[in-house]
Structure formats: C-alpha cells, structure tokens
Amino acid sequence: MENSTEVVSFVLAAYGHIGELKYLYFSLMLLWYLSVLTVNTVLIIVIYVDKKLHEPMYILLYNLFANQIGASTALYPLVMSQMFSDTHEVTLPWCFLQTYYLYICASVELCSLVAMAYDRYVAICCPLYYNVIMNTRQVGTLSVLVWMYPFINSVFSFSFVVPLKFCGNVIDKVFCDHYLIIKLACSVSVLNQVSDLLYAFSTIVIPFSLILISYMKILPVCLNTSEENRQKAVTTCTPQIVSVSSLFIGLIFHFSDSRFDVALVSDKVRIFLSLFLLICQPMGTPIMYGYKLPKIRQSWKRFLFDIK
C-alpha cells in the first residue's frame, strides 16, 4: 500500500471487543463528561458575574476552566461514539482535527499555568508593584499569548503531518495520537522528526522551565516572610503546584505509551494511564481551585445559594 489515497481512515485498535460493557462504559463516560462541563461552566460564570473576582489570578483561571471544557469536548464525544462502532474507524480529517485540538489544549494548559506562576511571582516577590505590573493591559496580553502561542506552534507542527502518505492505518489507542500517526507514514523525513522535537521543546520544556524558575524565586521569599504571608502564599500556590505535577505525570504516561514498548502492562491499565490526563485534569482543576481558593469558594457558594 504505497498510495496515500488508499488510506481514508484510521482504526483505533485499543477498543478491542468490549461487548455488553460498552453500555456501562458509555454511561460512566457520559456522566463524567457532563460533570466536567457543569463544574467548569459554573466556575466560569461565577468569575464572570462576581466583580470581586475580576483580578488577574482569577481572570487567568477563567482561561484554564474554559480550556478544560475544550479538552474534554475534543476527547469524550468521539470516544463515546466509538463505543457503539464495530470497526472503530475515524476518517483522516477527524483524526487530524482531534489530535490538533488535543495538542492545543495541552499547550494552553501549560501556558495558563506559566501565566499564573508569573502572577504569583509578582504578587509574592514584588507586592508593592503588583498593581502596576499586572494591570488590565498586561493581563489581556497574557491571556492572548496563552491561546495564540499554542495555536501557532500546533499549526507549524501539523503542517508537516497533513501531507504525509500513509502505509498503515491502525492506531493502538482509544484516540488519535500525533506520534502514532507519524509512525504510520510510508516515509518520515528528517524535517518531520525535527519538527516533532521542536514542538515538544516549545510546548513542554519551555513552559515547565518557566514555571520552575518562577517557583524557585518564590520559595526563598516565602521562607523569609511572616507566618501569615507564608500561609497566604501556600494557599494560592498549592493548587498550581498540584496542577503542574498532575500535568507532568499525565504527559509522562501519554508519551511513554506512544513511544515505548509497554507489552508488560495490561491493556486496561495502559488505556487508563494514557487517558489519565484527560480524565483527572478537567475535574481535578476546578475542584482544587474552587475548594482551595477562599474567594472562589465563597463566590460559588453565594452563586448556588442565590440560584436556589
């Protein structure tokens, strides 16, 4: 099979034969997806409605919650539709679109955490200049960069994938994966390999490095401040540190599953680990921030009470 026109769809082989369990899996996934949409939407509305939350940190959180909805929408509808498919086929355009969208969402997540880490750095290390540095224009610029940087990076990376000719169509996963798609190509140029490495560097290594630098600067200040200020710093920084750690673990699972031989791991465990990021993060993020940050916790309680 040397002609790329013969490959019109990819087969998601990780589903296997789930039999009657498809109804249980579908119900659980639908419930989880609706829960993710509800929780994140409520927090978005709370931040939008409550003027007390119109501060840099909460505006940046607004982007994070919106991205959780986008990432979940990129995954769950397709996965749920595949539950009732006998062939588990996905057309090339849809597969490319899902991969592109998922990679954008992962990058937006990291960029949002970078912006929030910078916000915490200014608030803790330069408190007297916080209102000057984190003004409305600066927050607006950060919000635009959070979305534009991933979009431009992904366009650049996928411009090398779309023209590829494919000699295989079986993807051993429950969703479309960028690296596994490239592996199915009849031939991969050095440019494709370099673009993949550059994409990983620009969307993962650089953001993680910036987050690490921010918290390395925050830590000495927290250690040399009063107990009250230290407690405030811990309260606002803990959800971000947990989010970054969870994201890091999820990315390790994702890339390990795509790039290494994991034959010793059972299929169910492997599927769960590859989905860890897209299952836990969309719900974990709103729970952590909605519960740990006092202002948001008070606001959504007032919001729910007023509705009732």
Regions found by a protein language model. Name each.
Residues 1-308:
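Transmembrane helical core of 7TM receptor-like proteins
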